[in-house]
Amino acid sequence: MKITGTRSTITFDLENGFRLKAQGELLINKKFVVYKDSMTQWEPPHENLPITQRGIENIINTAKKMESNQTIQLAFV
């Protein structure tokens, strides 16, 4: 998974054609708060496919496993 972002959004690219964009806030000390309730649909061309709660949980778990002291720390709220 590739994770990219701006000061107010984060994109989770599953590297299989599926991408999910979420809203959030970049904080000080290399932290980013991700608003889970904004994780509602895939980016085009898959925007018509539903994303399940399990799919969201898998994205969160994978992202948390990728964290290290060298990366931005993600907090899902």
Q: What kind of region is each of these model predictions?
A:
Residues M1-L27:
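Amphipathic, interaction-prone secondary-structure segments
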Residues K31-V77:
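Acidic, low-complexity intrinsically disordered segments
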